[in-house]
Design a protein with these regions (language model features):
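NAD(P)H-binding glycine-rich loop region in Rossmannoid oxidoreductase-like domains
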Residues: 31-90
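Conserved Rossmann-fold NAD(P)-dependent oxidoreductase catalytic core, especially the SDR/UDP-sugar
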Residues: 90-139
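A hydrophobic C-terminal alpha-helical subdomain
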Residues: 193-194, 254-297
Length: 316
């Protein structure tokens, strides 16, 4: 049996769907009852459990020879730090402790544990060292702590491999956790843009990359799952979104300090915590995953097209 935590989230749902298409027996862990019912229709065994429920996690992971630890919290404000650490760090530690020590454990970290880079020419690789001030970014700090538990377990002999996906987008995110910048831009609510950039990757490719990691990844190693042509500045990202949708919106290009100051006055739709991440450079190099596990991300133009069309269709 394969155990998938965070199975009711955007990536988790896609991973379970792929595993079931392959005929794999899946135990899908999550908290969203409606999404769990959807997973049951796919033939997965739904288990309603949270990452702070030790007894529930132990029972859910029992008998699983492969664990995909996808569950995680995404938030960026100082006030979220304790919640982030509880889920992304302590949740990982608990699952490693409670799951079968003989099971292969695929830990989903993030490029947030490796970056940001110093500029658009500083591509994040698996050996990239994050800057000293990364601890000021609550999400990054929590993912670094969780990844540390996973890598320490590997050093102690556990069969653990780490995935570091970049910014995940794609069709099907009904909650809007990854598509809100697109929605805000198309509605004319993102009136300014600033320096910085991100690396996009398709959720469908990350799901297939995780399966490839489980099959071919080396224990104790990281693998960046990112689009090979996914590195885009914010200005280029929104320009492409506007062209695909046929709705180009005017944006003022602001220096990072001014953009950060504006979030204090106008916190919506961009909060100060999110802006601190967005004004950095998160460009990535997925060469290792492509070379060692056969990771083949689709062209990012295809992903953007599918995503924007999904956003437009779901807004009608």
């Amino acid at each position: 049996v394969i155990c998938v935590t965070g199975a009711t989230g955007f990536l988790g749902l896609e991973l379970v769907r792929l595993l079931r298409e392959r005929g794999e027996p899946v135990r899908a862990l999550g908290r969203d009852e409606k999404a769990l019912q959807e997973l049951a229709k796919l033939g997965a065994e739904p288990v309603r459990v949270s990452m702070d429920n030790a007894e529930g996690l132990r029972d859910a992971a029992a008998g699983c020879e492969l664990v995909y630890h996808v569950a995680g919290l995404v938030a960026h404000e100082k006030r979220d730090r304790n919640r982030l650490l509880a889920t992304n760090a302590e949740g990982t530690r608990k699952l490693l402790e409670l799951s079968d020590p003989r099971a292969r454990f695929v830990h989903v970290a993030s490029v947030a544990t490796l970056g940001p880079g110093t500029g658009p020419g500083d591509l994040i690789s698996e050996s990239h060292i994050p800057p000293a001030d990364v601890d000021r970014l609550p999400y990054s700090a929590s993912k670094i702590a969780g990844e540390r538990y996973a890598l320490e377990a590997a050093q102690a002999g556990r069969d653990v491999v780490v995935a570091n996906p970049s910014y995940i987008i794609g069709p099907g995110d009904r909650r809007g956790g990854t598509t809100w910048p697109i929605r805000a831009y198309l509605r004319g609510r993102l009136r300014f843009v600033t320096s910085g950039g991100l690396c996009l990757v398709d959720v469908r490719d990350v799901a297939s990359g995780l399966v490839a990691l489980a099959e071919r990844g080396k224990a104790g190693e990281r693998y960046i799952l990112a689009g090979r042509d996914g590195n885009l500045s914010h200005a280029d990202f929104f320009r492409e979104v506007g062209e695909i949708a046929g709705r180009r919106r005017f944006q003022v290009n602001l220096p990072p300090r001014l953009a950060l100051a504006l979030t204090t006055v106008f916190p919506w739709p961009v909060t100060r915590g999110y802006a601190k991440i967005a004004t950095r450079w998160w460009y990535c190099d997925p060469a290792k995953a492509m070379r060692e596990i056969g990771f083949e991300p689709r062209p990012i133009e295809e992903t953007l097209g599918d995503t924007v069309r999904f956003v437009l269709d779901s807004s009608r």
